[in-house]
Amino acid sequence: DPRGCLYGCNGSCNARCADYVEYILAKEGDVAAVVVETVRCTDVQIPPRAYYETLRRACDRHGALLVLDEIPICLGRTGRMFAFEHYGIVPDMVVLGKGLGGGVFPLAALLARADLDVAAEGALGHYTHEKSSVGCAAGLATLEVIEDERLLQRSTDLGARALGQLKAMQARQEAVADVRGIGLLLGVELQDAAVAEDVLYRCLAKG
């Protein structure tokens, strides 16, 4: 959150935190990967382009992988199939989930550069219902619907409209501290925790 930034960005992100990541990579010398949630889902923190450009250069310079967690925001929520497409960079790995199964079946995926797409003879851990053929069918159907119904453009258009309406509401409501959005990933930040809790339960009551 730029307003609470420890690096003195004074309310507008200057990507100094990304410079600090490079400092750590240089000092440590043996960091395997930098793992980042591309756009923070829970409170919709949207980094500037310079942030990811700096991270990408830093990882390349110091031999670390850039791994992006897009589990909660993948496949169109931001108006692009992958949120990292907004930043003009390509990660070494990207993790997908949630929406990948169309909201009806648990499914996750790890996409990787071709030279990293290797598997050992034995592996542990996995799950998310262990490579189910039903889940894979749901995932393929989801991708087809996104493409056939042009849902990426729909997300962009509806998101812009919704963000405009929310910003108009912000101008009328003193309780609203900030409004942020990218595609249909939208966030409204309220000034007061008690007001936020009241709004939460009113929303739940209305379904």
Predicted stretch roles:
Residues 1-207:
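Conserved N-terminal phosphate-binding loop of PLP-dependent enzymes in the Aspartate aminotransferase
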